[in-house]
């Protein structure tokens, strides 16, 4: 089935990445049928999504309601963005993360299996499955082990990947696991609507705009400037990668399971991110306070996305400055006006 005729289900479509993805999806394929499953009745994305998007408020932990809803939607393609994603919170509430991320995914798979038809599933995984990997940049062919992930969030995604890879031995599922590194930027007017986000860049931008203190967690890592180093990817580049993965899977029907790293291949320290933001907001000065490290944060995460470039023809094009400037526009022009 061609992309333009597909029925697409987006789980977590009212969240940051999910809503940006729908925006990019409809720009490229305006005639696809899009349905969303989410639990966030108050998401600002509800005010922005076009009327053609059908939104269903269903908790993935309610298997009966989820099964009924998916039977009604009868999707051909599923993009699974729904998850709890805070590393810090996962160390405090590990069972909650296993429930939402692992059990929720299992319930989704049960519901999709009931359709008794082939399904293409694109799973939002994470760099956290690698933990503090000793090989940098982190290659896609690194053998995942349960002990590799350094926090319950990463473990929940690792276990989900194992389940998905096992299920692709059946004829019903084709699965692509897309391992995100740090996502930033916006697909304006869509962006990170989460008022309680723990991500560095939105909190940094809000600190500048609201003239409040920004907390830097850890300046004593074994890195070039003592702060964590992360690989960042613009959310629009990330969405483009999902659409390229879909097109690639359509052209390769014999593929059962594949995983791709999605990042820029370049590491930026927290101090470098702060300095880039400082240049955007100059002459405004950041109020900064250094705190102790957060539990579960590896010192360095940088990706090798050679396979994504080779197979998907994926090449991120948006710089760190572009990520910060787009997200600044989102918070200035859209976030506080909704």
From Swiss-Prot:
Superkingdom, taxonomy of origin: Bacteria
Keywords carried by this UniProt record: Carbohydrate metabolism, Galactose metabolism, Isomerase, NAD
Assembly, per entry: Homodimer.
Protein role: Involved in the metabolism of galactose. Catalyzes the conversion of UDP-galactose (UDP-Gal) to UDP-glucose (UDP-Glc) through a mechanism involving the transient reduction of NAD.
InterPro entries to which the protein is assigned, alphabetical: Epimerase_deHydtase (IPR001509), NAD(P)-bd_dom_sf (IPR036291), UDP_G4E (IPR005886)
Cofactor: NAD(+)
Similarity comment text for this entry: Belongs to the NAD(P)-dependent epimerase/dehydratase family.
Pathway in which this enzyme or protein is active: Carbohydrate metabolism; galactose metabolism
Reactions catalysed according to its record: UDP-alpha-D-glucose = UDP-alpha-D-galactose
Active site: 153 (proton acceptor)
MF terms in GO: UDP-glucose 4-epimerase activity
One Pfam short name: Epimerase
EC number assigned by the record: 5.1.3.2
Protein name, per record: UDP-glucose 4-epimerase
Gene Ontology BP term (one): galactose catabolic process via UDP-galactose, Leloir pathway
NCBIfam families: galE
């Amino acid at each position: 089935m061609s992309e333009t005729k597909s029925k697409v289900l987006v789980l977590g479509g009212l969240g940051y990445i999910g809503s940006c993805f729908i925006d990019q999806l409809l720009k490229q394929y305006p005639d696809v049928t899009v349905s969303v499953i989410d639990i966030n009745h108050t998401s600002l994305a509800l005010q922005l999504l076009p009327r053609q998007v059908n939104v269903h408020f269903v908790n993935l932990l309610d298997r009966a309601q989820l099964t009924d809803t998916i039977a009604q939607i009868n999707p051909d393609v599923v993009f699974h963005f729904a998850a709890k994603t805070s590393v810090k919170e996962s160390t405090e509430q590990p069972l909650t993360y296993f429930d939402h991320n692992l059990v929720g995914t299992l319930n989704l798979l049960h519901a999709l299996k009931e359709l008794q038809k082939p399904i293409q599933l694109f799973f939002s995984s994470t760099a956290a499955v690698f933990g503090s990997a000793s090989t940098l940049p982190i290659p896609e062919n690194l053998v995942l082990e349960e002990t590799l992930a350094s926090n319950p969030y990463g473990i929940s995604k690792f276990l989900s990947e194992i389940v998905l890879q096992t299920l692709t031995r059946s004829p019903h599922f084709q699965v692509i696991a897309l391992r995100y590194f740090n996502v930033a930027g916006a697909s304006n007017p869509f962006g990170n609507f989460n008022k309680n986000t723990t991500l560095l860049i939105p909190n940094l931008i809000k600190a500048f705009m609201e003239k409040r203190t920004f907390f830097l967690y850890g300046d004593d890592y074994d890195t070039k400037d003592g702060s964590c180093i992360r690989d960042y990817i613009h959310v629009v580049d990330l969405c483009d990668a999902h659409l390229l993965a879909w097109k690639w899977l359509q052209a390769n029907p014999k593929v059962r399971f594949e995983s791709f790293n999605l990042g820029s291949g370049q590491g930026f320290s927290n101090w470098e991110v702060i300095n880039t933001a400082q240049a955007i907001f100059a002459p405004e000065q950041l109020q900064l306070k250094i705190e102790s490290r957060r539990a579960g944060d590896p010192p360095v995460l940088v990706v090798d996305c050679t396979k994504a470039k080779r197979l998907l023809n994926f090449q991120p094009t948006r710089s760190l400055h572009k990520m910060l400037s787009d997200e600044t526009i989102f918070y200035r022009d859209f976030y506080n006006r909704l």
